Structures are given as structure tokens and as C-alpha cells.
Amino acid sequence: MNFRTTFAALLVAAGSLSLAQGCSSEDARSKPRSSGTSGMVFTADERGNSISVINLRTSMVETTPISVSPHNLQTSSDGRSLFAVGSPAEEGGDMTNAMDGPGRLLGFDAAAVSRGSVFDMAVGRKPAHVIVDRQGARAFVTNGGDNAISVIDLARRQTVKSIAVGKSPHGLRMSPDGNTIYVANTGDGTVSVINVRDLVEVVRIPVGKAPVQVAFTPNGRYSYVSLRDENSVAVVDTASRRMITKIPVGPGPIQLFALPSGREIYVANQGTEAMPGNTVSVIDTTSRKVIASIVTGAGAHGVVVSSGGDRVLISNTFANTVSVIDPVSRKVVENVPVGLGPGGITSRATKD
């Protein structure tokens, strides 16, 4: 097992190990430090076949090997469960997630990831992203190799439906009202809109070259779609279900996320492995223009906002770090080492 040491020397004395997840003395973790920010952040370490857990209050990191090369992960709305998707570990790790065989969906207790998964089930080919409905009853997984979305009953741990969408679906998000899911179809330049009640695709919206992920404004009026091969972000009016404009950003935009205020969208510009991007574009949602560019680590990929809304977290795929951004100053306040090849990123609140 390979674990990563972060921020300080490995803490040897067992009495000094204070991570609340009940991990063993073999785990490498950072020296605790106090912070005004709380919550937990999880990264899908695709090259390391692991999940890293960051305690935002202490900056302690725990990295746990798992049985897949996870591309993406997501917590449930109550923060109790964590779900990860990817290819079997012996097949993945090349950052493409391009295996032909079935992928896997793993479920974890979000407070005890180091104990291993509580379930492991097959999904479709080339799984990319996973989301969970508000009730925690169903999970939705994009299967890029099947051009479909798996709908999973989490109580029965069974796939109950496969929804046909566009070519090579990748990222997906549920609208704030929970009624629709927007799916970025990387292979055909469209976004599929799924009716959550009926579990059917109701429309397919043309947006541009290689859409990777979507983000909603908190009021649900607009969806922002990263267009990797155009170095831009498309803006979709969710009422008319039409694209209304495009906003130039940095090279190879991947994930994006709105601040709780809805005033700004943070876009991670990954670039390519040969020419990595290392910036985050900040879009003003009123002017629909980039108002700041923040330097992060190489291969800025995933974006999430902390549960308290006071930090923006960026996974840096080629730097093996997470950049912690203060959205007020728009500056990186910390770079946290995690596992190898962090891609997907998610967060949850804690009671501490």
C-alpha cells in the first residue's frame, strides 16, 4: 500500500494521530493545524487507485486504496454516504477511463472511508460520473461506452433502468429543484436533459465541441457547460433549453461549480498532459465574462465548493494536489498533497 505524507513529517507516535476516521498507524497524514474552515473533501485518485480524504479544519489527509481506478465520486445530500465510479484497478490508471469492460460503483460510509466499501456493483462500460438524488434513493451513472445513464436503486443495489442519451456521456448534474438532470455528451457536442420522474431524455441541446461537465446557478435558471475543445463555457437557458452564449476561458476546461451566491462560476482549466493548464477562470454570472484567473497546480480538473461556502477546492490532476481557494480574495491559500491523479472531487459538512 502506498500512502502519501502531507504538509509535515509522518507522525510516528500513535498518540499523536488524531484523525477521526479510525485509521491505522500505517496511514500517512499531515500534522494537524487549526483553521476556521470545517468539512471534509474527497478526491478520486485515478492513477493511484485510491480515495483521499482531507479534513479542512486540520489539513490532515488520509489516502485509502480501493478496488477501482476512480474517475469521479459524490457524497449523498445528507453527507453520510460516498459513491465512487471507475474501472477495475488492474485495468485503469491511465486517466482515460477507457476500458471496454463493465465499470464499478462503490459505496462507502463517508465518515469511515478507510474501512473500505460497503457495497460494490457493476455498472456500464466506461463509467465517468455519479450523482445521487436528494432522497438518497437513486444514483445516476454516466456510461461513456454505452451512451447511456444507469439508474440504480440504492436500497436494492440494483440497476433499474438504462436511459439512452448522446454519444460518450461524461459529467452530469441534477437541477436545484431535483426535476431534471443535465448530461454533458462529450462525443457529439450536446447536453441531454433527463426528466427525473419519468426517467427519460426529453431533449438534446447542441452546445459545442466536447462538453465535459455542467453546473447550475442556485436558482436553476441557467446551466453552464464546459467545452473542452473550444476553451469556452456555454450558457444554457433552462426555461427555453437553448444555448444563449459562450464565454472564453482557459485551455481545456473540465469541471465547473457555482458559488452559493450564484454570482460566480469557477472553471478548472486542465489543458492536456503535454501542455497542462494550471488556472481557474472565475466567471461573473451577471456580465458573463471572466473577471479573474487564479493560478493553481498543473492539470486543474475538479471543482467543488466547501459545505460552508468559504472555500473553493480544485483537484490538480498532474500535480497530485488540491488547491484551496479563498473566494473573497480569489487567492490560493493552500495546496494539499493527495493521491496520484486526483480528478473528481466532492465535499461534505462535519459536526466539529
Task: Please give the residue ranges for each predicted region.
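Alpha-helical hydrophobic membrane-insertion segments
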Residues: 6, 13-16
